């Protein structure tokens, strides 16, 4: 049974981590199927970590206390308060000391994997250029537009019934047609979208970001143009196209540093996977010989 397998303290720590990272919930909220899936993930992860920490490459690898403290602070930041973190630990019968110990183990595994990659060559400008020109479609930026004001429909409130909401936004639109430069001011006063505090600014959006009803209008608009009143499932909208950035191809110079980092990371991950496969195969062979 998964619940029996996950009874020890170490596994409870792993369960807390897997539940949040894989399923986005607390361990107690996992279904039986999810719990069994978590059990398989944990078993595989512990098997790999054990192999890594027993490998010759792990000899002499030490985690400095400052790195552990930084990682612990990162975990604590996910919770509203130290008390909330303690409650989460208590719910899984864990304590801070035990969790720190498991965190130190994770960090040491990561450090060993970093050491394994120490001899890898750096990604050269030629490597980056070849990837860029062979995958040019990955570096196309679609057209982007800026916009937005919203009045929601909510029949539970007299001021937000469908008829009242429509009247309000038509009044706003009439006001803006005379002075579109007042868009940000009107958005801050009347918009019920979270973007109101930024003057209704959605930022640069690409097709498919907004509701289809809004997309269909926005990407036909010219710079400085106001839309008619539009309706989506959440209410009425007026769009203002503040600017238009046409679709374009990013240059190699623009993306070279980020692409180099991406390719370097991909190379490291591929090498680590290859190293782990070899390590696990060697361990399996030794176990077979020992039991043969």
From Swiss-Prot:
Record has Heme as a keyword: no
Record keywords, A-Z: Isomerase, Nitrogen fixation, Rotamase
GO biological process: nitrogen fixation
Record Gene3D superfamilies: 3.10.50.40
Pfam family, one: Rotamase
Any one GO MF annotation of this record: peptidyl-prolyl cis-trans isomerase activity
Domain PpiC: 148-243
EC nos: 5.2.1.8
Physiological role: Required for the activation and stabilization of the iron-component (NifH) of nitrogenase. Probable PPIase.
Cross-referenced NCBIfam families: nifM_nitrog (TIGR02933)
PANTHER family in the record: PEPTIDYL-PROLYL CIS-TRANS ISOMERASE HP_0175-RELATED, PEPTIDYLPROLYL ISOMERASE
Family, as annotated: Belongs to the PpiC/parvulin rotamase family.
Name by which UniProt lists this protein: Putative peptidyl-prolyl cis-trans isomerase NifM
Organism: Azotobacter vinelandii
């Amino acid at each position: 049974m998964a619940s029996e397998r996950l009874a020890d303290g170490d596994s409870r720590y792993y369960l807390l981590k897997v539940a949040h990272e894989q399923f986005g919930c607390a361990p107690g909220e996992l279904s039986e199927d999810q719990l069994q899936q978590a059990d398989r993930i944990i078993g595989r992860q512990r098997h790999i970590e054990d192999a890594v920490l027993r490998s010759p490459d792990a000899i002499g690898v030490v985690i400095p206390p400052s790195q552990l403290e930084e990682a612990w602070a990162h975990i604590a930041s996910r919770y509203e308060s130290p008390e909330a973190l303690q409650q989460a630990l208590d719910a899984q019968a864990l304590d801070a000391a035990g969790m720190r110990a498991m965190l130190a183990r994770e960090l040491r595994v990561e450090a060993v994997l970093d050491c394994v990659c120490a001899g890898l060559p750096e990604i050269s400008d030629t490597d980056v250029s070849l990837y860029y020109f062979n995958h040019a479609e990955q570096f196309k930026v679609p057209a982007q537009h800026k916009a937005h004001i919203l009045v929601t429909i909510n029949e539970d409130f007299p001021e937000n019934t469908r008829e009242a909401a429509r009247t309000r936004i038509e009044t706003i639109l009439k006001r803006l047609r005379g002075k579109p430069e007042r868009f940000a001011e009107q958005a801050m006063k009347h918009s019920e979208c979270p973007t109101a505090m930024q003057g209704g600014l959605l930022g640069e959006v690409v097709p498919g970001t907004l509701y289809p009803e809004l997309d269909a209008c926005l990407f036909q608009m010219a710079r400085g143009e106001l839309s008619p009143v539009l309706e989506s499932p959440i209410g009425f909208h007026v769009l203002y196209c503040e600017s238009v950035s046409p679709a374009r191809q990013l240059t190699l110079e623009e993306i070279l540093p980020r692409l180099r980092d991406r390719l370097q990371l991909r190379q490291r991950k591929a090498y680590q996977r290859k190293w782990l496969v070899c390590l696990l195969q060697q361990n399996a062979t030794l176990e077979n010989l020992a039991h043969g």
